[in-house]
Structure formats: C-alpha cells, structure tokens
Amino acid sequence: MNIIKKTTSLTLVAVIAMSGCADLDVSNSNAPDQSRALAKPEDVESLIKSTFLTWWQGTHTTGGSFNPGVMADANTSSWGNYGMRELASEPRAAANNSPAWNYAYALEQPWYSWYGAISAAKDGLSAIASGQEGGKSFLADAEADTRAKIFADFIMGISNGMVAIYYDKGFLITEETDFSKEITTVPYDELMAGAIAILDQVISDCSANAAVSLPEDWLQIANLTLGDLGKIAHSFVARFKAGVARTRQERGAADWASIKSHASQGAPMAPAGDGDYWWTRTQYYTGVSASWGRSDYKMLGPADKSTGYTNWLGDGSDATIAGRKAYSMETDDARITGPLDADGLQTQGLYAKNEYRTRLIASRGLYHQTYYLFNRTRDYAVDQGLVGPMKDINQSELDLLQAEAALRANDGATAATLINKTRVSNGALTAAAAGDGVGSVSDAANALDGGSLWAKYKYEKIIEGCLQHPYTGYTDRRGWGDLVKGTPTMLAIPGKELEILLMENYTFGGQDAIGTPGTAGKIRNNGHRSRGFNIEWERVTPLNKADLH
C-alpha cells in the first residue's frame, strides 16, 4: 500500500540529562527557532489543534495498532505485517526490540507519535504563556486562550496515559516540566498517575468553562463544548485506571469506586473520518478485507454451544495448539451469525460472518486459522467510504467498566443489568441474572447460560471492544491474567530510543521469566541525535491485497 505522508517538524529545544546516561544535545539546527516559528497566534492555535490528529494516528493509524489485538487473541493473523506473526505465534516469543528488526517501526511509532503530540502541546502552552505576559490575551481573546490551554492539557494527559498503557516506563512531561533540569524515566504506574492528574485538572477546567465551544476540526466532532470534552476526559480516566494494570493483582487493587464514578460521568468519542488524514487503519483494513479481519476463536469460542471450542482448546499443550483447526461454531449470539439460510449455512451476523473457509497460510500455524471474519467496521470502511464515525470510546465500554466495578463489589444485580445492555440488545442472548452467581475474576470467558457473571462479563467486554479502541482487549486480558503465557505484558522503550539514550536494550515476553525484562539487541552507535519530533501524518490510500506478506 502506498502511503502519502504529510510532515511537520516539532522541536523540544532542551537538554535532557538521564541518570547513568550521557547528556543529550537536543537542539535541532535544521528546525526554525521556536520563538519565530510560534510567534503568530494563528500558528500556535493551529499547532495545538493538530495535536489530536497526532495522538489519533499514533493510536489508530500506525501499523502497530494491530498488535494489541492479536496479542490479546481477539483478532488472529499470521501475516508478517507490522510484526503480527512474531507477536502472536505460539509458544509466544519475547518482543523483538532490536532497531534492526524489520518491523521495529511498529513498536516505535506509537512512542514517537504520543511524545510528538506531547511536544507540540507543550510548545503551544509555552507560547501562550509567553504571549500572556503583562496580563494580555495571546490568541483572539481570553476565551480562545482558555480553550487552547485546556485542549493542550487534555492531549498531554491522554498521550502520557497511552505511553503508560503500552510501555514499561517513559518521561512524564507536563506543562511545568523544566528541560534545564535533569529528567529521568518513571515506571508506568507513576507515569499514569501523572497523566490522570493532568486529566483531573482538565475535567475541573472544562466544568468551569463548560459553555465554551470547541471547533469541529479540533476533535473531528461537531457541536462540541468544553463541557463535552470534560465528559470525554472522564472516559479516559476510567479507561486508564482500569487498563494500566499489568497483572490480575494490580487490576484488582485499582480504585474501582473511582473507575465507576468516572465511567458514569463519561461520554463516547467517535471522530469523523474524512477519507484523507483522519482515518483508522484497523477499522479500515478489517472492514474492507477478509484477509485482515479474522476473529480468533478465543474471542468467539466462548459462545459455542457445541463441544467444538472445548475440543479446539484441548489441554493447551504445544502439540494440541499446533493441531488446532478451523471449524464452524454453534451459537445463538446474533453478533456472530444471523439465521441459517435455505442451505443451512450461517449468514452474516451483526459483527461477524462465517466464511466456511480460512485465509491464513497453514504452514504458519493452523491455530491461527479461523472461518470467521470480524467485519464489524464494514459500515465505516465500505458503506460510508471512510467518512463516517471512527469509534474509540463506546457507551458499552463505559457501561461494562461499571459492570466490573459491580462484580468487584459483589453486586450481581447491578452487574447483570449492565452486562445485558449488550448481551441481550446486541447478542440476543438469554439475559444474565444475579442468580447466575458473581463467580471469580479467574473464570474463563463464557457466554453460555451456565456461565457466571464474571464469565459473561469477560465475553461481553472483549467482543464489544474488539476493533474499536485498539488497546482495550489487550489491557483487559492483561489485567484479568488471561493473556497467553509468554505474551509481553508491556513493551520496553523502543530499541532505537534506547540507543539514543545510551541505555542497554531489554524486552518483555517469551517463555522464561514471564513479565520481567529479558535481553535484546545491543547498542550499535554513540546514541546522539537531534531530539526533534518529525511527525508524519499518513494519508489513506486503497488497500492492496499484495501488501500482505
């Protein structure tokens, strides 16, 4: 596939010193002086509004956006693209963090995109602060200054938060960060705490300025106010507090009362695609191509009434895994199949379709193969021609987070009511009830009538979240302790960045020392560079089947 890239250069003019590492000269001699580049108010406002596109593409458009789904076994793929085959094959191997790896970019792009958004937001905030000296407004008026500042803070919050979701550590960069002083990496939990503190302030500021309008092209959503942005910030806080956990124990220790509160005050987020720079690779490719949108049986199988899924799972041994073969399920879930046709074949379901064929290469692992296409996003990718809503936060995500809070509080009645919003309305399945029993977080996902509420909840959370926000299925399974053994529970700082920082390379995953850093490629050069963020926005072009490899 050919990708046309629009480039803008953003620079953090600073010197960052890290503990145990060389000082880094981060000035960019090829970039314009910051004070001149951001001297005009309209340039600053344009820079700030562009930050969400940078965040969006880092989350939804980079090739790496496919990897969380296949590591979570919601989607399945043995194609090499973006490193999917290596990250999803069994037995799981450690993530390849060598900068020389063919697909290193898939692990690097989210990191650089999110820090690029942070960089631009911080530059914009600094320019506004400088322009306000003497008590004057820098942009058109005080309201414009307030809107731009709150929006930039929102971007810094959700960008720091995504780094904490995916990587083991990072730099906590805020409006107050002073680059003349030493800055060190912080672990993911500390990074997330900082991100949430920013978003909590955004929520407060949005409440105080709720009536201020937000231009449509800032978030690609029409008729939005800062009051609405505050609700979206609530959604992110709920998602982040639940999703940051690396283990079952950490997720259990989360503040579920707070998660419930934020989720109940949250709102969905679905920017409008424009068929140009505003697009989502995961929702496009899987909606238009049967070779990309394959459903893993670990996602759909819990709804199988036959013994097929149990037989497919087997005893979980390497030999059993290698012998797994695609099969047709028997299910009442309307999301997976519609009524049988005249020939007794399953028809298109709400989200999926039984193609009665596999499309993945058998020699790369029969266990990857599936008959089921998960083409839930065909409305965006085909019917609407990439110009419809691109869903990131659904109401179902917010409802189901509240359901998990209820389960953890042993409130089966409330949990059942929330689970049924999708189980019954979308799946046309028998309603869950308090009498099913709360069960335990260790219960395997199970959509069948005999399953516990925890089992039914897990099934709903995975199928409803699949191919919406790319990371939620991965963070859910990670926090429930349900990832396949050896799956990386997070990524290391990208190997390319480790070279720059003169830090030893490391990685996560594999069959030994699960969840602890392993070894990877070593430093290859002196690690110095200009620390300018070169943001490339990718323009969508038609998918070419020949791109699969």
Where are these regions (language model features)?
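Sec-dependent bacterial lipoprotein signal peptides
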Residues: 1-19
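Bilobed periplasmic-binding protein-like "clamshell/Venus-flytrap" ligand-binding domains
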Residues: 4, 60-66, 461-479
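Membrane-proximal, proline-rich intrinsically disordered regions
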Residues: 21-78, 451, 481, 485-549
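Structured, solvent-exposed acidic/aromatic patches
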Residues: 41-42, 84-398, 408-414, 450-452, ...
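Surface-exposed intrinsically disordered loops and tails
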Residues: 211-217, 430-447, 513-523
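Active-site-proximal region of nucleotide-activated glycan assembly enzymes
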Residues: 403
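Active/binding-pocket-proximal capping segment
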Residues: 414-429
